[in-house]
Amino acid sequence: MLDIKQNRRAMKYSSGEMSRRVLWMFVQPLFRFSPRPCFGWRRLLLRSLGAKIGRNVHIYPSATIYFPWNLEAGDESAIGEYAFIYNLGRITIGARATISHRAHLCAGTHDHTKSDFPLLRPPITIGAEAWVCADAFVGPGVTIGEGAIVGAGSIVMKDVKPWMIVIGNPARESKRREITQ
């Protein structure tokens, strides 16, 4: 039987994390209400709270970032409108990767096999030049390979090979991504 009472009493965050969460609560309105083209301002705010943000990264003001200090975004990557970055664990987004409109990256879960239901924080890695399309969900501990595409609305709970396109719920391989030019 689950011991929910024990879970609710468990210390899930260190005092340092709690302090940073409170600071982020005060800074977040400066992020959220900044004009849409002010990408540099939002990069500065996130960096000031420990995020590792590369050059020319576009993060839109309506994106939700849970723990800035657990975010790494490579050069020229993008986090789109209303994307939800639930980064209890580290989330790494490679150079020129795109997290589209309303995509959800979830680097947190619970161990359902233990009675106290402890919090787990498996990291997520999005490879360089990968694309997580609109309304897609990427679960805890998943790696999306370089150049891979997660189709719109897909649910990804397993690693995706480099340059592979996955679609559906659960996500399954559709075909290999080919770049023509």
Feature map (PLM): residue ranges:
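Terminal amphipathic alpha-helical/low-complexity segments used for targeting or macromolecular assembly
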Residues: 1-51, 55-56, 96, 129, ...
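Short, electropositive, low-hydrophobicity segments enriched in small/polar residues
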Residues: 54, 112, 155-158, 172
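Beta-rich strand-turn-strand
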Residues: 134-158
